[in-house]
Amino acid sequence: AGEDHGRGPYVQADLAYAYEHITHDYPEPTGTKKDKISTVSDYFRNIRTHSIHPRVSVGYDFGGWRIAADYARYRKWNDNKYSVDIKELENKNQNKRDLKTENQENGTFHAVSSLGLSAVYDFKLNDKFKPYIGARVAYGHVRHSIDSTKKTTKFLTSSYGGLNPTVYTEENTQNAHHQSNSIRRVGLGVIAGVGFDITPKLTLDAGYRYHNWGRLENTRFKTHEASLGVRYRF
C-alpha cells in the first residue's frame, strides 16, 4: 500500500472487550499462617468479570514487522456479599441453643493502567488483508482491597412454663480480615488479529490478546481481550 510499501509511523485507537480472571490466595486453616486464618469466602478468591475500555497505541511499521507502545485503563470492579446461617446446637428441656454466623464482605479490584510494548509480524495475503501475530511485554499497575468480617452469636431460646419464648445471648465472637495493596509488575502476553486496509494509510484492525500480569503478591491476574480499532499510518 503506497510507494513506501507500508512503512512509517502510525497511531492506533481501539475499543476492547476484556474478560478478566482474578485469583487471590489468603491464609488457610492448615497453612503456615494458621494463626491468621482468613474469613474471605471463595467468591472473592476466584473472580471472573469483564469490562470495556479504550486503548491507544503509537508505533512504527517496517513493512512487515511493527513495533508499538500502548496504554490502557480498565474499569474498577467492586462487589459486596452478605450471608447468614443459623445452626441448631441443642434442643432439650424446652431450651434450644443456636449458633448464628454472619459474613459481610466488600471487595474491589482495579487494573489502574497497563503500559505495553509489542512486536508484531504482518502476513500479507493480498493488497487488503494482513493477518498478524506478536508478543507483548507490559508494565501493569493494580490496586485491590478486601474487607471481610465474620461474626458468630450463640443464643439460648427458653420456652419453659409455656410462656412466650425468651432469648438470651450467651456468646459473641468476631473475626475480621482487611487487606489493601497497590502493586506494579511486568507481565507477558501474546497478540493475534487481522488488518484490513481501507485506504493506503488507514487500516481497520480486529485483534485478540492474552496477557498474564505476573505474580502480584498473593494475586494472579489474567486478561483475554477482543478489540476493534483503526490504525492510521503517516
From Swiss-Prot:
Where are the annotated coiled coils located? none
> What InterPro entries does the entry give?
OM_autotransptr_brl_dom, OMP/PagP_b-brl, Porin_opacity
One Pfam annotation, family name? Opacity
Protein origin, superkingdom: Bacteria
Gene Ontology cellular-component annotations: cell outer membrane
Q: In the UniProt record, does the keyword Membrane occur?
A: yes
**Record keywords, A-Z:** Cell outer membrane, Membrane, Signal, Transmembrane, Transmembrane beta strand
GO MF annotations in UniProt: porin activity
Q: Where in the cell is it found?
A: Cell outer membrane
Q: Where does the signal peptide begin and end?
A: 1
Family the entry assigns: Belongs to the opacity porin family.
Instruction: Tell me the function of this protein.
Output: Implicated in a number of adherence functions. OPA proteins are implicated in pathogenesis and are subject to phase variation.
Give the protein name, as stated in the record: Opacity protein V28
- What lineage is this protein's organism placed in? Bacteria, Pseudomonadati, Pseudomonadota, Betaproteobacteria, Neisseriales
